[in-house]
Amino acid sequence: MREIISIHIGQAGIQVGNACWELYCLEHGIQQDGTMPSDTTVGVAHDAFNTFFSETGAGKHVPRAIFVDLEPTVIDEVRTGAYRQLFHPEQLISGKEDAANNFARGHYTVGKEIVDLCLGRVRQLADNCTGLQGFLVFNAVGGGTGSGLGSLLLERLSVDYGKKSKLGFTIYPSPQVSTAVVEPYNSVLSTHSLLEHTDVAVLLDNEAIYDICRRSLDIERPTYTNLNRLISQIISSLTTSLRFDGAINVDVTEFQTNLVPYPRIHFMLSSYAPVISAEKAYHEQLSVPEITNAVFEPSSMMAKCDPRHGKYMACCLMYRGDVVPKDVNAAVVTIKTKRTVQFVDXCPTGFKCGINYQPPSVVPGGDLAKVQRAVCMISNNTAVAEVFSRIDHKFDLMYAKRAFVHWYVGEGMEEGEFSEAREDLAXLEKXYEEVGAEGADDEVTRG
């Protein structure tokens, strides 16, 4: 088996995790208590969904996941929520005091006390796998736990499981909406780790997803639940081929191979189509070319940046539902002839496609309509640098005055780490710029 372990860190990671596991259970017909009426081979772990769920002798399906937070309130919601019987209590790890939006607390002081416990639980999950393929790590980098403890866990996973892939689903601060003054610090310090210790990181930001909910689903005031359900559709589409047997499967390591031209250039944009409410879906049949065009629209991007300002290095299109390869090829040819979608000279073809015949499921009573076919795109575009330059600019404004720095130093950080992380990001922005500007003949070396 090629098992995947999911690690959900901090409030954002846990709440996105809840939405994902709710959706996986629906897709596989797993009940809230972990039983699966349709599973005829009870206790036999050769079904495709066993990549994400382990099976007990009694036929209970347990997610291969851990949830970690430095304070208990968010995890307590899982402990008392609808899916409380799905998880083993040891998979839900919470501390007593939170990271107070401080990277240094999550990484050095409070986080240090809990990290060994987390790694012990991960080790138990890993020992239960026959061929562990890698980790999915969910966190936000604006807060203290997601950024600090998230980085610490990634660093330790690199030591313990060097060769295993690590995919991050990372929620970045939004351009306009802020939940903490020190978000730029936490993000820059955390990205410094993501650069080193993840193989692929998919960037998400709440503001972009708010706009999609408002525009496409007519939700006037989207809640985190609305956002997370949309995010979970993307993550589900990415992992469909690991959980179901499909036509053209895409493996986690294949993402890496196809999307990452240079090790550090691994921050991805994602988009999903159709995002459509039940009222509208009733009147529209969305064809493969239509949904394929939709995922290339700037307004479909799940992070606030405009792909037209950059060039694509590669993109993965994951179709699911009623889709045949012939339609996909035709749609891709049409996109290639469009002048709005530009590729860097070095990768003129740049498309990797996957098809899975399992149609998308939706949460009953949710906002998304049940559709026959959907597509999710993960793309590597140089415009992603916009996300970093925005955060770097805010970082610089605060750091020039050394504002709030004492909170970090007081928790055992050194001031040098700020400038080191900031320089690392400056180099990353430059690297993106070079890839976008590259001609066919000038070789640029990238560290």
Swiss-Prot record:
Family from the record: Belongs to the tubulin family.
Keyword annotations from UniProtKB, A to Z: Cytoplasm, Cytoskeleton, GTP-binding, Hydrolase, Magnesium, Metal-binding, Microtubule, Nucleotide-binding
E.C. no: 3.6.5.-
GO BP annotations listed: microtubule-based process
Binding site for GTP: 11, 71, 144-145, 179, 206, 228
PROSITE patterns named among the record's database cross-references: TUBULIN
Cellular compartment(s): Cytoplasm, Cytoskeleton
Family annotation (SUPFAM superfamilies): Tubulin C-terminal domain-like, Tubulin nucleotide-binding domain-like
Gene Ontology MF annotations: GTP binding; hydrolase activity; metal ion binding; structural constituent of cytoskeleton
InterPro entries: Alpha_tubulin (IPR002452), Beta-tubulin_BS (IPR013838), Tub_FtsZ_C (IPR008280), Tubulin (IPR000217), Tubulin/FtsZ-like_C (IPR037103), Tubulin/FtsZ_2-layer-sand-dom (IPR018316), Tubulin/FtsZ_GTPase_sf (IPR036525), Tubulin_C (IPR023123)
Record-annotated active site: 254
Keyword NADP listed: no
PANTHER family: TUBULIN
Pfam families: Tubulin, Tubulin_C
Keyword Metal-binding assigned: yes
Catalytic activity: GTP + H2O = GDP + phosphate + H(+)
A GO cellular component annotation in the UniProt record: cytoplasm
Primary localization: cytoplasm
Oligomeric and partner information: Dimer of alpha and beta chains. A typical microtubule is a hollow water-filled tube with an outer diameter of 25 nm and an inner diameter of 15 nM. Alpha-beta heterodimers associate head-to-tail to form protofilaments running lengthwise along the microtubule wall with the beta-tubulin subunit facing the microtubule plus end conferring a structural polarity. Microtubules usually have 13 protofilaments but different protofilament numbers can be found in some organisms and specialized cells.
This protein's name: Tubulin alpha chain
Entry cofactors: Mg(2+)
Major enzyme class: hydrolase
Role according to the record: Tubulin is the major constituent of microtubules, a cylinder consisting of laterally associated linear protofilaments composed of alpha- and beta-tubulin heterodimers. Microtubules grow by the addition of GTP-tubulin dimers to the microtubule end, where a stabilizing cap forms. Below the cap, tubulin dimers are in GDP-bound state, owing to GTPase activity of alpha-tubulin.
Gene that this polypeptide is encoded by: TUBA
Residues binding Mg(2+), per UniProt: 71
